[in-house]
Amino acid sequence: MKYESKSLLKIVISYMLFGFFWIFSSAEILHSITRDMSTYIILERYKSYFYVILTSFLLFKMIRSSYFKMEETNRKLQQDIVQSFITALEFHDKYTKGHSEAVASYSTEIGEALGLKGHELDDLYWAATMHDIGKIIVPIEILNKEEKLNDREYKIIKDHSKIGYEIVSKNDSLKKVSKYILYHHERWDGMGYPEGLKGDEIPLLSQIISVADSWHAMTSKRSYKNQLTCEEAIDELINNKGTQFAPKIINVFMDLYNSNEDAFMFEKSH
């Protein structure tokens, strides 16, 4: 807000100074352009139009510059906030270290292949980075339990998407991506959580994160499960296409994987 106020004040002062300059100097400028009285009269008649055009252009340039600077400042602040969240989560559970980064990387690859651009691709990146932030309230003994979870423990685990939604929606600059976090455990067949959304009722960005999240979870080491080979994980994705996962997303993922397997072997490259 302080930056925005300073930028607006700068624009207003610049506009006022140019206005005063034009009022007191425009006649001299016209005289320097021409000594012919008929030409001078024509220029005098149209100088107000010229002033409007010139100041409009200058205002546009200044506002545009201010906007981009503000965007960069907000993005840096947003990045710092997200990194604080992720650092806290990784401190809480060492097995999540690198998971958020990997899911964001995979999700972005898929999003670009689907033609996402600009703010939509940014939203995907931030949502994927923070998709598991709600796990920060899940007791570590439940997160890393090797035995099958009981009903109470499973409910606590499932609540992490709701908690993540609540955390992120409280931040003005991030709340627009909170719904993608909320729905990243929905299933294509409607058997997911928290709301049992089905098919394209599930937001596209959540569909993407679901596949990226599952891929990294299957191909990563965890205390409570065996790490799958890439071939085994591919089989799981294909076998659950149209049930757990959106067919379109799986098709895109397979195309990307077949063209560049190394891009989807995060554990080996980090």
Regions found by a protein language model. Give the residues of each.
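N-terminal membrane insertion elements
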Residues: 1-68
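Electropositive phosphate-/nucleotide-binding environments in soluble metabolic enzymes
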Residues: 23, 46, 50, 79, ...
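Metal-dependent catalytic cores of enzymes that make or break cyclic nucleotides
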Residues: 86, 90-270
